[in-house]
């Protein structure tokens, strides 16, 4: 990226949709109360939620240990460890990983026949509580608006078949299925994630796009 390249953040979705913020050199905070990118009416933002870093013509974003996290749109298949959070449409989801197998030597409650290995994906609702969930043997777990393993028919930002998790004993590989609204993964706090024009970042209710200009 050229040192002369000018960058800006445009709010694509949220109460400030259409607003644009030019990014000067240095560290640019984003949150409800601190920094250049302020969204005081967003209840899901920390006072200082994330920081954009512009240095030597390069741009990165860093989550500042915010409770609701910073998410980036995936451009290729992304590896998920058990417990990882990702977002599709208006839904926050957690990949739970493989469920504990039932010991053949212990008594157990009656139920449907058990698969040799099940993998879990669950919705996280406001307050961090679990919502809808599914457990499937794999190798693929699908998420979308309808006709998928985990479906959310009322979500207008979800494609009919939005994303897939290709599961294995060590985790999962998350793939977006060419959707208009994309699939997002949560960044670990404190890690600087490189960005280029065209990338999208979600913080709280705000969907931000990196652009030249």
Task: Describe the function of each predicted region.
Residues 7-12, 68-72, 118-126, 182-185:
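Short polybasic amphipathic segments
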Residues 10-14, 53, 62, 124-126, ...:
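A generic structural motif
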Residues 19-82, 88-89, 135-205:
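Forkhead-associated
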């Amino acid at each position: 990226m050229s040192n002369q390249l000018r960058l800006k953040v445009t709010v694509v979705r949220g109460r400030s949709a259409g607003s644009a913020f030019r990014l000067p050199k240095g560290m640019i905070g984003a949150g409800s109360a601190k920094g250049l990118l302020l969204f005081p009416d967003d209840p899901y933002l920390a006072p200082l939620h994330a920081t954009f870093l512009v240095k030597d013509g390069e741009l990165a974003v860093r989550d500042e240990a915010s409770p609701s996290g910073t998410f980036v749109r995936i451009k290729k298949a992304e590896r998920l460890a058990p417990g990882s959070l990702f977002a599709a449409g208006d839904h926050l989801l957690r990949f739970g990983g493989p469920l504990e197998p039932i010991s053949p030597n212990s008594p157990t409650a009656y139920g449907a026949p058990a698969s040799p290995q099940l993998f879990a994906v669950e919705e996280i609702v406001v307050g961090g509580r679990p919502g809808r969930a599914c457990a499937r043997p794999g190798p693929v777990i699908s998420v979308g608006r309808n006709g998928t393993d985990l479906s959310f028919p009322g979500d207008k930002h979800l494609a009919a078949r939005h994303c897939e998790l290709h599961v294995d004993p060590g985790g999962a590989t998350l793939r977006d299925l060419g959707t208009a609204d994309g699939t997002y993964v949560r960044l670990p706090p404190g890690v600087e994630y490189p960005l280029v024009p065209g990338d999208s970042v979600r913080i709280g209710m705000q969907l931000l796009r990196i652009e030249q200009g």
